[in-house]
């Protein structure tokens, strides 16, 4: 994937999560919960792009991929063949792309804001403990992250 594709991809993952929440009938959520879970999906997308995962991250990124697929179908999104580079098709990342992806992940992880940063940290703890699907189910029922 081209380097600008990392930034574009993680922003799209974040914004598509907003669409998923609306299209799947989630209640109006607090900004911390909504932006937090959207940042979690963006972070998981970045991880899937740059990290050869352990078994736990593979399961989490598989869940994220399933949710992303649901979002794409629900939003009737289409991909264009020209939107990927030959390196993305081969699954190869340059050292620069890996470092850039790690930088973007670090920015999400260390964001000092209450809404995006604290929301992400609460969301990622929930996803690590309950999985993405379990966390989303809890958010849909209660409007909050599971504790």
Where are these regions (language model features)?
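An active-site-proximal "capping" alpha-helix that borders the catalytic cofactor pocket
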Residues: 32-47
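Internal, charge-rich low-complexity segments
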Residues: 47-68
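Alpha-solenoid helical repeat scaffolds
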Residues: 22, 47-48, 129
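Active-site recognition of the HExxH zinc-binding catalytic motif
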Residues: 10-23, 35-39
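Intrinsically disordered, low-complexity regulatory regions associated with ubiquitination proteins
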Residues: 18, 61-82
């Amino acid at each position: 994937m081209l380097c600008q594709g990392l930034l574009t991809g993680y922003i799209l993952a974040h914004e598509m999560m907003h669409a998923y929440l609306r299209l799947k009938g989630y209640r109006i959520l607090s900004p911390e919960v909504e932006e937090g879970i959207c940042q979690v999906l963006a972070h998981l997308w970045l991880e899937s792009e740059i990290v050869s995962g352990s078994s736990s991250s593979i399961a989490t990124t598989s869940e994220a991929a399933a949710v992303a697929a649901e979002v794409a179908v629900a939003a009737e999104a289409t991909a264009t063949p020209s939107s990927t580079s030959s390196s993305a098709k081969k699954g190869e990342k340059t050292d620069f792309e890996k470092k850039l992806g790690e930088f973007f992940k670090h920015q999400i992880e260390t964001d000092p804001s209450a809404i995006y940063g604290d929301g992400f940290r609460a969301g990622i703890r929930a996803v690590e403990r309950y999985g993405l699907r379990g966390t989303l189910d809890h958010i849909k029922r209660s409007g909050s992250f599971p504790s």
